[in-house]
């Protein structure tokens, strides 16, 4: 069935208007307004809906999820603090309702909101809580994976669990719906709904290993390939490509080296001091002894040059070389050997990082688009690459600046013949290795099906969606959709959520690069950034 591009988002009494990022949306006098292509405005500050008026909670929010060619109404929150058998945790009530005209006789609505088969195979699930100010993420701890299907007009009450939350408000990443700010309340708060805590926890079977929040991390790559940077809460790590900064088998800095090192120096100069570790690495072409010496010499050359570009007096320095002993990737291809020839600079400020992105200073220009390009609100129509597999239109009206993040909800609509393949296989995913994420970590199925290829082009850098690493997991996941298995028919629509680091710009450029087995490059320009 075809779905409308408009959707109604209302607040409950007692809740701030700054609650929901909706698409399509416009900033209008008096509030945040959503509108459809026909221009009919829908004001998010409207009176409570009938469903909200009948609810016992005065702090829940009506939202809409658009996926699988259907529109689902979801009553969200508030997040409720509870205790059970001496353990503190939180429960997020979600009441999901299908429309009366739903096409399918039954639908697993829980899989849309909580994740389906691929998510059940691991710890990562699409439903998450975000603290944009503190750069933290809570993943739902729910282990339950089997739910009753829902027919047209039917409803399902879900009670996913999370660990304890110490914030007053959090932003819910509601898969295929948006970013919804909800209050966090105690169980005895007048705004809290009545909950059967024992039953909710018994059904959820919470995973204790996922109780604690994890840090949001930021990854960027210079467009000229000279550097890549990763920022966590404690440190910033910059890989400087040796092929740019040094000649072959040499420890003498090239004339182009400063293009890479100035950006590193600016990052260091933004902090008052701390620990600075500079480590050289090589490929495995020469013998061990030669590579060890070369890596040490290159690390020293970088340290000396950084000391001339910025004051390192307040930094405790460690300069060393690892030779070929710690490759970033396998040395079995030229591309792999090139990645391993690097000098790693780890900046650990005494008071931690300030969530700032690592920015290069090389002056590389934004490359020409290799696929369809349009302004974000207009939308770009994309064919299925060289193989001609389907067609979709990608649209992004705006992104919301909240805390240290930019939050976007893209609208994906099937074109002539539809998408033909799942949205997570080429249309929106990172076009690198099939099961690997952008860092080269083996990610499994939820890496394959994620919309982790939605990058920003800013200055001289390509900036990836923020990501995070759950306990006992070996690979990071992007703060975006994780299980895009749906295949859109002609006219069917799905919404896709994604969070990026704040670039500090008034408009952004979203770029899905070429590459991979199913290359589908496209670009959206002039996407407004609005305060949230």
Predicted regions and their residues:
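Periplasmic peptidoglycan-binding/anchoring modules of Gram-negative envelope and division proteins
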Residues: 222-235, 245-279, 303, 307-308, ...
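N-terminal secretory signal peptides
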Residues: 1-15, 19-33
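Bacterial lipoprotein signal-peptidase II cleavage site
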Residues: 35-44
């Amino acid at each position: 069935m075809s779905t409308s591009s408009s959707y109604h988002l209302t607040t409950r009494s007692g809740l701030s208007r700054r609650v929901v990022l909706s698409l399509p949306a416009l900033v209008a006098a008096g509030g945040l307004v959503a509108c459809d292509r026909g221009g009919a405005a829908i004001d998010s500050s409207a009176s409570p809906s009938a469903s909200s008026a009948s609810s016992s909670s005065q702090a829940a929010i009506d939202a809409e999820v658009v996926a699988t060619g259907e529109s689902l109404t979801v009553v969200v929150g508030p997040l409720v603090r509870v205790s059970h058998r001496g353990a503190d945790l939180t429960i997020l009530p979600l009441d999901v309702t299908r429309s009366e005209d739903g096409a399918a006789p039954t639908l697993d609505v829980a899989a849309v909101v909580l994740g389906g088969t691929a998510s059940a195979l691991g710890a990562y699930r699409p439903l998450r809580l975000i603290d944009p100010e503190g750069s933290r993420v809570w993943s739902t701890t729910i282990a339950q994976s089997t739910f009753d299907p829902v027919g047209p007009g039917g409803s399902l009450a879900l009670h996913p669990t999370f660990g304890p939350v110490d914030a007053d408000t959090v932003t819910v990443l509601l898969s295929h719906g948006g970013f919804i700010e909800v209050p966090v309340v105690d169980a005895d708060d007048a705004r809290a709904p009545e909950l059967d805590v024992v039953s909710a926890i018994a059904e959820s079977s919470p995973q204790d290993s996922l109780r604690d929040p994890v840090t949001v991390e930021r990854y960027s790559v210079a467009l000229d390939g000279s550097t890549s940077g990763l920022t966590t809460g404690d440190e910033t790590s910059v890989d400087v490509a040796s092929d740019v900064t040094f000649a072959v088998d040499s420890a003498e800095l090239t004339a182009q080296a400063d293009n890479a090192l100035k950006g590193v120096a600016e990052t260091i100069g933004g902090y008052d001091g701390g620990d600075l570790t500079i480590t050289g690495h090589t490929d495995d072409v020469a013998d061990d002894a030669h590579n060890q010496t070369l890596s040490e010499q290159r690390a020293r050359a970088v340290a000396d040059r950084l000391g001339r570009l910025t004051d390192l007096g307040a930094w405790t320095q460690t300069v060393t070389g690892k030779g070929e002993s710690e490759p970033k990737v396998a040395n079995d291809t030229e591309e792999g050997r090139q990645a391993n020839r690097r000098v790693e600079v780890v900046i650990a400020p005494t008071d931690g990082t300030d969530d700032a992105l690592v920015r290069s200073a090389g002056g590389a220009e934004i490359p020409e688009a290799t696929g369809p390009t349009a302004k974000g609100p207009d939308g770009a129509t994309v064919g299925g690459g060289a193989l001609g597999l389907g067609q979709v239109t990608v649209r992004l009206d705006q992104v919301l600046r909240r805390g240290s993040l930019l939050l976007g909800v893209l609208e994906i609509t099937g074109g002539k013949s539809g998408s033909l393949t799942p949205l997570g296989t080429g249309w929106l995913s990172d076009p690198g290795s099939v099961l690997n994420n952008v860092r080269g970590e083996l990610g499994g199925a939820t890496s394959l099906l994620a919309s982790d290829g939605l990058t920003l082009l800013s200055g001289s850098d390509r900036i990836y969606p923020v990501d995070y690493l759950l306990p006992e997991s070996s690979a990071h996941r992007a703060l975006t959709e994780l299980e895009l298995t749906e295949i859109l028919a002609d006219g069917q629509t799905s919404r896709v959520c994604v969070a990026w680091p704040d670039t500090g710009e008034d408009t952004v450029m979203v770029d899905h690069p070429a590459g991979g087995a199913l290359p589908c490059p496209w670009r959206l320009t002039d996407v407004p950034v609005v305060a949230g």
